[in-house]
């Protein structure tokens, strides 16, 4: 299983079943990230809370690997808000320590078009 697949599977289980065992397996105990909106440093527990609050409003496409090295991974995905036609493109850059995620940074950009048009997937 690739690191992108492991990341995807872990967070998908968390979204569907609210089970974080796979998330806990792939994250380093010293994990820290800076919230992209608040600029505040957060730990994994805070990331889990935010994820659960947001995911019920979003439809996510599968993550696609953009770039990968020994200690980093960059993935891209599209999101759509369930309640309205707001589309986003997001990139997450992940760094690893001892084979586990130690930091991640996500950057999103609102799109003025539906990225599913002309693709082999839809919402």
Give names to the regions the model predicted.
Residues 1-123:
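C-terminal and inter-domain tail/linker signature
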């Amino acid at each position: 299983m690739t690191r992108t697949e492991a990341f995807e599977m872990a967070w998908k289980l968390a979204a569907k079943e609210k089970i974080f065992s796979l998330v806990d397996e792939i994250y380093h105990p010293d994990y820290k990230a800076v919230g992209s909106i608040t600029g505040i440093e957060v730990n994994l527990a805070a990331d889990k809370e935010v994820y659960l609050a947001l995911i019920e409003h979003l439809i996510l496409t599968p993550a696609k690997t953009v770039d990968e090295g020994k200690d980093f991974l960059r993935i891209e995905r599209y999101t759509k808000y369930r309640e309205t036609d707001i589309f986003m493109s997001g990139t997450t850059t992940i760094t690893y320590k001892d084979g586990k995620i130690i930091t991640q940074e996500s950057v999103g950009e609102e799109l003025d078009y539906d990225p599913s048009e002309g693709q082999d997937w839809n919402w």
